[in-house]
């Protein structure tokens, strides 16, 4: 008879108990991983994972999946409870927003429970996932959480919700160093302090194996005591073993970025920590000078200066910077191979710039800071800028239709500095100690329990037989599962094909909508153009009406003519694009139809597969029910066996526990022995070290004594040398006489120089007279110009004829416009027709979907009926299968399944036929049921027989139990003996503990000895220091004796006295001569300064006169045009001229352009400031006035020659990256020659010119390689030229500022236009102007472009030099921020 299978262990299960030694150690390791806050699977990470899964799955579309729905039902409530218990944003009161960035904002908050103040940083999850390469928050969190450095801003808590990440940091009320530099003029003493703190802070970051890469004053915050801490570690990067970093993108702020980091954007991204020291050099320069060393208005200008730093780095003459400070800045701002700090921070610390009496490197944080912030309360935010409220809508994740995992990238972000979860409690410690005692007590049990293993072997054989039976059942199950998996994979492949087609369909629909949008856009453009044409017609009619009273200039007509031509050209292009759009729309509609047909086919296939799947699922359910019935029978039979085997299992567990206890006690014994040996080794090592250190100190003392004796011997030698020096004094007297002669010659030279200066002054007087003569000549020219006015009236008659021709052209253009209108109407009709077609298709699609849903509903009803009938039939079949052979049953089942498949396929054709088939099937099932009932009676008979057999088995097992009771009694006796052995072991353990205490006492003695040795060492070091000081004092004393003058005993005393008298006389003469010379020099210097000031004043007066003359010329021009208009009006009224009269010339009112524009002012390094000026453009000059009163008084601020204009263009964000983004559409740039400018005084520093070798010359351009992180397009191919993180290589001309892809140059494409600006850069200037609106900007640009001369102006070698050179602040002078009175230092 075969034994029934047991329900105990599965095959292949380990025989050892779960509480053995190896298992416990694994559990402890696992517990350590969970407790470790740096571990990726710590408690907070696990909770984050569960929370994220629930948030990502809790959507209606995903809940349709049964497994997901079960998961959410199980964990949704507990996760909500966890969220309520964890830290959240509602635990804090927001005081104020103190900062805002691209990913979120920084808030000043107060914790409701503790009332502590923090700075809380919010990062939007949506924004970070939307932008690629934005996992910067991990580095920032880890550095602030685990740095434990006083130079790094600390992170207290990090938590998250479904929309934001939150970082609760310490609040730094002193603000950043940008605020400090804008409020104070930073002296060198302060700069020394803050630079030292930055160096120490960066050294702390570097020691963690990281490079900051964005060191700037914005990221340097001051605490309440005024000391510095670093912040914003989003750009930090881990160094490799060599201390280097590999990165292909330029990271950092333009003004502070190093040349090697800039080069990395080309692909050579290989640099080390030295890039941070470059930024420190820029920061130090900015503190001392008030501006960054490589400042430029454009991004390209800044980058070109950084790359050419050897030539572009210069110090202002008016800035008070010490030699050591300049040396340090130059040492930082050099090539990375020789940069200071490359070999370690000690290089920087030893630099003489940092020598001072107030602090040293070890105690700098304990000393008083230069500026201690004055705080009114703990929430004082006066040192931060006021941030406007963000009223924009916050973007969130859209509701997904499939699993997206938006919360998964943020798992593990949560962090608490005071982590109380799973902390070691006293109860845990007590249980651990009890467990260890128990383990120690059962050491010896293992030896005596080996005999019991023989008794258990018989039982294991029976168990193996049962396991084999289980395996056979499992193989059958696996076969059925494989068949199911094959069907599922087939279905998945079809579904994926369906999804692909749906995607293609969606793409085509999107393209169709895009083309439709473009067509609408083109139609709008067309309407605008028509409106423009109508407005132009209206303007023409107005002009005709005005001509009846007065003649108007022809330039207006020419301008209108040009505009008409442009509109015609635009209309033609619009019509072409509309035709193209029509074609593409037709093609897309065809593709949509094809896709819809494919979609229908796939949906049919999907229906077939779903029916097949349902059949397979039903079969699987039947098989499972059969399996369950088999398992019930098995469990019923095995319950009896389990009762019998329960006691055996208990004995097995006792045996295994005994083994575990034994192994643990042995391990502890070994560990104690090893620890004892280690302590003895440490003791011996300590003794050796102490003896060695004592020997070293003694040797150093002996060396010092030897050196002391040597110095004494040297001093004796020097005394002898001193006596020989006295003899050489007579020779020194002769040298003094020679010096006197040289002084006299110098005096003569100075007098000659003064004569030359007087000659120059006389020449300048002549120049003044010549300038006055020129003014008289200009007045004469004015009279000549009045005569020219009369001649211009003759030209007007010629212009009347031209006007008639333009009117005829206008008529022709109106006809063309009408034809274009007709074509547009046709396009609209066709478009409407296409839209109707699209609507019909969508309706048909909706109807088909409804029909499919109805059919699915009917199918489900039929399937429910089938399942109900099949349930009854399967119950009977399962009872029959238990007694019949499995092979026969499977063949029958296969036949039945095939019949069902055919029936289900027939059901799809017609629902009525399916109902009939199901009825006939039910009749056949009833017949089968009656047969099964007959077979059931036979089974009951067999069941009675089986019960009798089980009773016999019970009797046998009772006998076996009595035998096993006897064995248990014997085992209990052995257990008693084992307990006595355990007691003995406990005594041994106590002895070992006593030994351990002795060892610990020895260790403490050793430590005391070590402390005493350290004290002796300190004493010796003090003695050494005193010896050194005595030595230096002796050397200094000897040097003093050496330099002291003593009368020489030997030789003739009278000769010496005589020579001394002569010497004194010569000294007196020398002094008198020097005094005379200095007086004369002071006198002549005063005269020279007065003359120079007079020249400067005269030149300034000359410039002002020239400027007033220019403004008067423009006034004369305006008056002349008005006079001309009056003459024309009189002529027209007398002659009675028609609408075709002449209009004015280029110099008359219509060509005159005037209005308010703003010029840039450098108030701050970070942003532009603007000053309004009233600007007038005449035929020859562009005049800038401070106000309208200055205009009336003819007192211009600046004048530019129109002949010297090179180029006028609107700017982009990269040209003026310091300006506000809203202002960019209103800014335009003027390029002009240097000599074409007259100005009252200098306000903008001239940028120094770099070497030409850094530029790529092509078609007159001078291209600079760069990268754009702001929105910019290529002006050659009009494709995007920018990317936020990985922009493509680009070029920008430093003359005309055209931007293009570098590939166009590399591939030698001819699409780049030639440079519009041909001039020498050394004589060229550019000027930025801000209009009141974008329309005004366009008007100014279009009008000024027409004024540019066709041939570029040649620089005039005899022309006057730029007035900037006369009255300007020199090129390298500093522009310091507006300062306020320095606050006195306060003790921290």
From Swiss-Prot:
Positions bearing Phosphoserine: 1137, 1362, 1374
Enzyme kind, highest EC tier: transferase
Residues the record lists as binding ATP: 98-106, 121
Protein name as catalogued: Rho-associated protein kinase 2
Residues of the AGC-kinase C-terminal domain: 357-425
Coiled coil segments of this chain: 429-1024, 1053-1131
Ranges for region Interaction with PPP1R12A: 363-784
Cofactor dependence: Mg(2+)
Cellular component, GO annotation: centrosome; cytoplasm; cytoplasmic ribonucleoprotein granule; cytoskeleton; cytosol; nucleus; plasma membrane
Regulation: Activated by RHOA binding.
Pfam family, one: Pkinase
Organism field: Homo sapiens (Human)
EC number: 2.7.11.1
Ranges where the record places region Interaction with NPM1: 373-420
Alphabetized PROSITE patterns for the sequence: AGC_KINASE_CTER (PS51285), PH_DOMAIN (PS50003), PROTEIN_KINASE_ATP (PS00107), PROTEIN_KINASE_DOM (PS50011), PROTEIN_KINASE_ST (PS00108), REM_1 (PS51860), RHO_BD (PS51859), ZF_DAG_PE_2 (PS50081)
Chain positions covered by the region annotation Disordered: 1-27, 1345-1388
């Amino acid at each position: 008879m075969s034994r029934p299978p047991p329900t105990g262990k599965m095959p292949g299960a380990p025989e050892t108990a779960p509480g053995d030694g190896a298992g416990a150690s694994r559990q402890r390791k696992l517990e350590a991983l969970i407790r470790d806050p740096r571990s990726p699977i710590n408690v907070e990470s696990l909770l984050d994972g569960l929370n994220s899964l629930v948030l990502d799955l809790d959507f209606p579309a995903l809940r349709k999946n049964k497994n997901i729905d079960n998961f959410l039902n199980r964990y949704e409530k507990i996760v909500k409870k966890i969220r309520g218990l964890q830290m959240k944003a509602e635990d804090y009161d927001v005081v104020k927003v103190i900062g805002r960035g691209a990913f979120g904002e920084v808030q000043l908050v107060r914790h409701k429970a503790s009332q502590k103040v923090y700075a809380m940083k919010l990062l939007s999850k949506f924004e970070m996932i939307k932008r690629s390469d934005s996992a910067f928050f991990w580095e920032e969190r880890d550095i602030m959480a685990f740095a434990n450095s006083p130079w790094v801003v600390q992170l207290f808590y990090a938590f998250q919700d479904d929309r934001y990440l939150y970082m609760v940091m310490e609040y730094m009320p002193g603000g950043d160093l940008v605020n400090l530099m804008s409020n104070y003029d930073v002296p060198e003493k302060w700069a020394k302090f803050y630079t030292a703190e930055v160096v120490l802070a960066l050294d702390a970051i570097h020691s963690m194996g990281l490079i900051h890469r964005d060191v700037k004053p914005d990221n340097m915050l001051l605490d309440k005591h005024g000391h510095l801490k670093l912040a914003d570690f989003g750009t930090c990067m881990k160094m490799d073993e060599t201390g280097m970093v590999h990165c292909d993108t330029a990271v950092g702020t333009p003004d502070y970025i190093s040349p090697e980091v800039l080069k990395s954007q080309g692909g050579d991204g290989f640099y080390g920590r030295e890039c941070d020291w470059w930024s420190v050099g820029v920061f130090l320069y900015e503190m001392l000078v008030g501006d960054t060393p490589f400042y430029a208005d454009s991004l390209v200008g800044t980058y070109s200066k950084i790359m050419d730093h050897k030539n572009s780095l210069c110090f202002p003459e008016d800035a008070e910077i010490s030699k050591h400070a300049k040396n340090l800045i130059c040492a930082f701002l050099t090539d990375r191979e020789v940069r200071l700090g490359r070999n370690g921070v000690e290089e920087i610390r030893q630099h003489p710039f940092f020598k001072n009496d107030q602090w040293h490197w070890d105690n700098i944080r304990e000393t008083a800071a230069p500026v201690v912030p004055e705080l009114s309360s703990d929430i004082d935010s006066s040192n931060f800028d006021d941030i406007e409220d963000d009223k924009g809508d916050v973007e969130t994740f859209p509701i997904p239709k499939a699993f997206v995992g938006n919360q998964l990238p943020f798992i593990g972000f949560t962090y608490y500095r005071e982590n109380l979860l799973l902390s070691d409690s006293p109860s845990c410690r007590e249980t651990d100690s009890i467990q260890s005692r128990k383990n120690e007590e059962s050491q010896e049990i293992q030896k005596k329990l080996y005999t019991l293993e023989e008794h258990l072997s018989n039982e294991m054989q029976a168990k193996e037989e049962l396991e084999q039976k289980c395996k056979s059942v499992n193989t059958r199950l696996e076969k059925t599962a494989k068949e199911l998996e094959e069907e599922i994979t087939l279905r998945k492949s079809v579904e994926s094909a369906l999804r692909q087609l749906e995607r293609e369909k969606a793409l085509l629909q999107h393209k169709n909508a895009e083309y439709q949008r473009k067509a609408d856009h083109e139609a709008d453009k067309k309407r605008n153009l028509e409106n423009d044409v109508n407005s132009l017609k209206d303007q023409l009619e107005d002009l005709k009406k005005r001509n009846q009273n007065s003649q108007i200039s022809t330039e207006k007509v020419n301008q209108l003519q040009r505009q008409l031509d442009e509109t015609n050209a635009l209309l033609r292009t619009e019509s072409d694009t509309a035709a193209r759009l029509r074609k593409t729309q037709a093609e897309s509609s065809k593709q949509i139809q094809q896709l819809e047909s494919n979609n229908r086919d796939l949906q049919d296939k999907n229906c077939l597969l779903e029916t097949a799947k349902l059949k397979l699922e039903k079969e699987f359910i039947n098989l499972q029910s059969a399996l369950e019935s088999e398992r019930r029978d098995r469990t019923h039979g095995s319950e009896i066996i389990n009762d019998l085997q329960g006691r055996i299992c208990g004995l097995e567990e006792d045996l295994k526990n005994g083994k575990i206890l034994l192994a643990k006690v042995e391990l502890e014994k070994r560990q104690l022995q090893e620890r004892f040996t280690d302590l003895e080794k440490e003791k011996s090592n300590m003794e050796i070290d102490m003896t060695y250190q004592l020997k070293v100190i003694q040797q150093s003392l002996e060396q010092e004594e030897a050196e002391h004796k040597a110095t004494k011997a040297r001093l004796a030698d020097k005394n002898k040398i001193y006596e020989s020096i006295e003899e050489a004094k007579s020779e020194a007297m002769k040298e003094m006489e020679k010096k006197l002669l040289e002084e006299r010659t110098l005096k003569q030279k100075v007098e000659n120089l003064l004569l030359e200066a007087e000659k120059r002054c006389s020449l300048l007087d002549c120049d003044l007279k010549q300038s006055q003569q020129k003014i008289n000549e200009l007045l004469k020219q004015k009279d000549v110009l009045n005569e020219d006015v009369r001649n211009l009236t003759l030209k007007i008659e010629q212009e009347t004829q031209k006007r008639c021709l333009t009117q005829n052209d206008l008529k022709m253009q109106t006809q063309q416009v009408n034809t274009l209108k007709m074509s547009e109407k046709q396009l609209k009709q066709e478009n409407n027709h296409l839209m109707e077609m699209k609507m019909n298709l969508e309706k048909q699609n909706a109807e088909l979907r409804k029909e499919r849903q109805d059919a699915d509903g009917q199918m489900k009803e039929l399937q429910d009926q089938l399942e109900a009938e099949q349930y009854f039939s399967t119950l009977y079949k399962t009872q029959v299968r238990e007694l019949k052979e499995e092979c026969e049953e499977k063949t029958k089942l296969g036949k039945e399944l095939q019949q069902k498949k055919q029936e289900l396929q027939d059901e799809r054709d017609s629902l009525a036929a399916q109902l009939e088939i199901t009825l006939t099937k039910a009749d056949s099932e009833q017949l089968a049921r009656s047969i099964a009932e007959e077979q059931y009676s036979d089974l009951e008979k067999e069941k009675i027989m089986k019960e009798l057999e089980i009773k016999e088995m019970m009797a046998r097992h009772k006998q076996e139990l009595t035998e096993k009771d006897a064995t248990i009694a014997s085992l209990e006796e052995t257990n008693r003996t084992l307990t006595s052995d355990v007691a003995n072991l406990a005594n041994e353990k106590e002895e070992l503990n006593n030994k351990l205490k002795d060892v610990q006492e020895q260790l403490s003695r050793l430590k005391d000895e070590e402390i005493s040795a350290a004290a002796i060492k300190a004493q010796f070091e003090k003695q050494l220091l005193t010896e050194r000081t005595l030595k230096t004092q002796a050397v200094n004393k000897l040097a003093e004796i050496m330099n002291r003058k003593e009368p020489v005993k030997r030789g003739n005393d009278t000769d010496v006295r005589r020579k001394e008298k002569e010497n004194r006389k010569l000294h007196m003469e020398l002094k008198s001569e020097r005094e005379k010379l200095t007086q004369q020099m002071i006198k002549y210097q005063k005269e020279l300064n007065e003359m120079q000031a007079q020249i400067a004043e005269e030149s300034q007066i000359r410039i002002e006169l020239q400027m007033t003359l220019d403004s008067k010329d423009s006034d004369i021009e305006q008056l002349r045009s008005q006079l001309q208009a009056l003459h024309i009006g009189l002529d027209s009224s007398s002659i009675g001229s028609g609408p075709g009269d002449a209009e004015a010339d280029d110099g008359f009112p219509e060509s005159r352009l005037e209005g308010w524009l703003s010029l840039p002012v450098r108030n701050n390094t970070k942003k532009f400031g603007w000053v309004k000026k009233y600007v007038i453009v005449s035929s020859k000059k562009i005049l800038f006035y401070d106000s309208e009163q200055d205009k009336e008084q003819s007192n211009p601020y600046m004048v530019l020659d129109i002949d010297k204009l090179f180029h006028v263009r609107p700017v982009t964000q990269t040209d003026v990256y310091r300006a506000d983004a809203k202002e960019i559409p209103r800014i335009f740039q003027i390029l002009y020659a240097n000599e074409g400018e007259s100005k009252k005084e200098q306000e903008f520093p001239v940028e120094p010119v770099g070497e030409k070798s850094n530029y790529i010359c092509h078609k007159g351009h001078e291209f600079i390689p760069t990268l754009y992180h702001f929105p910019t397009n290529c002006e050659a191919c009009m494709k995007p030229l920018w990317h936020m993180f990985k922009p493509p290589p680009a070029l920008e001309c430093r003359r005309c500022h055209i931007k293009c892809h570098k590939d166009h140059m590399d591939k030698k494409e001819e699409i780049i236009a030639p440079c519009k600006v041909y001039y020498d850069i050394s004589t060229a200037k550019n000027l930025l102007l801000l209009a009141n609106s974008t329309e005004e900007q366009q008007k100014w640009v279009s009008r000024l472009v027409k004024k540019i001369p066709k041939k570029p102006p040649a620089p005039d070698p005899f022309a006057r030099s730029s007035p900037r050179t006369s009255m300007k602040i020199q090129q390298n002078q500093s522009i310091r921020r507006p300062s306020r009175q320095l606050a006195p230092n306060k003790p921290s």
